[in-house]
Amino acid sequence: MNNTNTKNSPENAKYMTMLCYTDRKPLGVVKDNPRTKVLSPVLVAKDPEWKPDFHPGGFSAYCANQISQTWLYDGIDEEVQIRVYKTKRGWSMKFHQFVEDCAVHFYDYNF
């Protein structure tokens, strides 16, 4: 899978990304059918190779390289499960939208 910033994640697994305002969270697909999917959160750890580049500004500081952040895969938390549904506008659950075939973890340091 090319749509990921999480290192060492299993290649044969299916993923989705939850869009949370400015942040992104990867989820693994546990159960799958055409109208409903059951997802579990992907556990990630900070990648020691990526260091945020902060500059003075904004509320406290501005992270200039946040778009290049990477994370390390640390498993899937199968105790927590959420159910998402296929709608006219794509995959969703309450107020969140989901992107298929994408495992992106993104923390917005500039929010």
What are these regions (language model features)?
Residues 1-26, 36-111:
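Mixed-charge, low-complexity intrinsically disordered regions
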